[in-house]
Amino acid sequence: MKMKNALIVNGGLNSTKRDQLGNYDLIVAVDSGTEQAYKLFLKPDLIIGDLDSIDEKTIKRAEKDEVQILKYETNKNETDFELALKHVLDEEIKDITIIGGEYGEIDHLFS
């Protein structure tokens, strides 16, 4: 079955409430966005990034939950968010919701 929509949960500040979100075919957590996802009672399908800002306890929980983890080198040309967005776009998903990363500066999302 082709996936129609995705949620990308970025790390950083997040003012989103669970009841503001719908149902998603794919939930992608970006590095420390995994912690945000779990706080919203969401189980990610995929964690993506260099995992430099996610604690070991959260990684162990994700492994127990059998979440797929795509770990990248810290020294890379793309941000973790860019890698997550590319992954979702490669799945040909057009309906994408992005939460988190509310630092106030959009340039923090892209390198």
Language model features: what each stretch is:
Residues 106-111:
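Short Gly/Thr/Asp-enriched flexible loops that form oxyanion-binding sites at enzyme active sites
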Residues 40, 65, 90-91:
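Alpha-helix C-cap/termination motif
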Residues 13, 51, 73-76, 102:
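Structured beta->alpha junctions
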